[in-house]
From Swiss-Prot:
Name the record gives this protein: Somatotropin
Tagged with keyword Metal-binding: yes
Stretches assigned to coiled coil: none
PANTHER family hit by this protein: SOMATOTROPIN, SOMATOTROPIN,PROLACTIN
Annotated organism of origin: Larimichthys crocea
One GO term describing the cellular component: extracellular space
């Protein structure tokens, strides 16, 4: 009997170790994807700002600080302390919703250059990768159904033909919000991955 219990313990430990290794592998892949998107967002935003006159930059930045990104309607941690207290599944679910919210707006960021054309396919890969992590980390006590993602309306002027000044503002808004949201996702995935490593220090 003791030998049977010992064998079961060894088998259980082996399965648990395999799950941890697979989780770490999936997290590493998604971390690489979101890092690439965040760096790309920073570069595109920086390039766009560099193309503006100083006064245009000042005015657009002033307007942006008064506006909200569409994704601000997605409930997420308000600071680093709340982020660190959030469960792995909660951080993954919020990350999924943030990425999903860019599925359509990202199309207007594509075109014109090779880096821009990477945005939509990279977002799709990241979305699928996060979904795999959600499914791998779900349990009976905390389940986020696939249809729980908040359906956000597109940006107010997304489908409209705009004048030069309005088009400039929309592009600035999209790039700034995209950069902001990719930074959020990168932070949440970093904390979630760290949470699965008991010996790690997950302080932001």
């Amino acid at each position: 009997m003791d030998r049977v219990l010992l064998l079961l313990s060894v088998l259980t430990l082996g399965v648990s170790s395999q799950q941890i290794i697979e989780n770490q592998r999936l997290f590493s892949m998604d971390a690489t994807r979101v890092q690439h998107l965040h760096l790309l967002a920073q570069r595109l935003f920086s390039d766009f700002e560099s193309s503006l006159q100083t006064e245009e930059q000042r005015q657009l930045n002033k307007i942006f600080l008064q506006d909200f990104c569409n994704s601000d309607y997605i409930i997420s941690p308000i600071d680093k302390h709340e982020t660190q207290r959030s469960s792995v599944l909660k951080l993954l679910s919020i990350s999924y919703r943030l990425v999903e919210s860019w599925e359509f707006p990202s199309r207007s960021l594509s075109g014109g250059s090779a880096p821009r054309n990477q945005i939509s396919p990279k977002l799709s890969e990241l979305k699928m990768g996060i979904l795999l992590l959600i499914r791998a980390n779900q349990d009976a006590a905390e389940i986020f159904p696939d249809n729980s993602a908040l359906q956000l309306a597109p940006y107010g002027n997304y489908y409209q033909s705009l004048s030069g000044e309005e088009s400039l503002r929309r592009t600035y808004e999209l790039l700034a919000c995209f950069k902001k949201d990719m930074h959020k996702v990168e932070t949440y995935l970093t904390v979630a991955k760290c949470r699965l490593s008991p010996e790690a220090n997950c302080t932001l």
